[in-house]
Regions:
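N-terminal subdomain of nucleotide-sugar transferases
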Residues: 1-59
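Conserved donor-binding/catalytic core segment of Leloir-type glycosyltransferases
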Residues: 9-14, 193-210
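Short N-terminal targeting/anchoring amphipathic segment
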Residues: 82-100, 113-115
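A short, active-site helix/loop in glycosyltransferases that binds the activated sugar's phosphate group
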Residues: 99-101, 150-178
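Active-site proximal beta-strand in glycosyltransferases
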Residues: 108-126
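Short beta-strand->alpha-helix junction loop in the catalytic core
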Residues: 120-122, 182-190
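Membrane-proximal helix-turn-helix segments that form the acceptor-binding/catalytic region
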Residues: 122, 137-158
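Carbohydrate-associated surface elements
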Residues: 165, 182-185, 196
Length: 211
């Protein structure tokens, strides 16, 4: 393992602290932080707390501290951080988060690689809602999201998708993007007993309108 002085620095920016035991997307982010923290010095910026209360926030902050990740929630100055530390790459979750921060990163650290993690393609999710409702307003919303989302992706050096299917959609809608797929990361576990049951219940996050 490299020494702290020689380790490259990564900047992660997310809407909130990763609630790794509550949502699939947050678990994926936490796993990425676990992996990258082995060989990188990481600064993690969260726009907001989790919304689960101070006790839960403290637990999630402690988990990041255990990985030696410097975490800042809400009250931080991106400009000061960018002026103080040279980053190899900035990884931002969601296109609307990236849209806020890319300009400052490119101005203050033009050599920093800008990476946008889609988590999922938002306009594709919105379109699935339209397929159910057949409401013209939902189609209009889908088209608006698509324009905004692709506009942001074009500014990035690399786009990360969770599935190859999402990568194919982006390649078709916006040729020329550099896309990499990083799926959900889980520890494999064996069921205590094999009962032949192959059913699976998935509960989507209700904070997403199409769900």
């Amino acid at each position: 393992e490299m020494t702290g002085k020689s380790r490259p620095k990564l900047l992660f920016i997310s809407p909130h602290l990763p609630r790794f035991d509550k949502t699939s997307g947050d678990l994926r982010m936490y796993r990425l932080l676990e992996i990258f923290s082995r060989d990188h010095e990481i600064v993690f910026l969260a726009q907001e707390e989790t919304g689960d209360g101070q006790k839960e926030d403290a637990r999630y902050l402690a988990a990041l501290a255990d990985l030696n990740i410097a975490t800042h929630v809400k009250d931080y100055s991106l400009v000061k951080i960018l002026l103080a530390l040279p980053f190899k790459a900035a990884i931002m979750e969601f296109y609307y988060i990236a849209d806020l921060y890319i300009p400052r990163i490119k101005i203050l650290q033009p050599k920093c690689h800008v990476i946008v993690d889609t988590v999922d393609i938002h306009y594709r999710r919105a379109y699935t809602k339209y397929l159910v409702t057949k409401n013209p307003e939902d189609l209009s919303v889908t088209e608006k999201i698509k324009r905004e989302e692709l506009r942001v992706y074009k500014k990035a050096d690399v786009i990360v998708t969770v599935t190859d299917e999402d990568a194919e959609v982006l390649n078709g809608d916006c040729p020329g993007l550099t896309i990499r797929t990083i799926p959900n990361i889980h520890d494999p576990a064996l069921s205590p007993q094999e009962n032949g049951n192959r059913n699976l219940l998935f509960v989507g996050g209700f904070s997403h309108d199409p769900n």
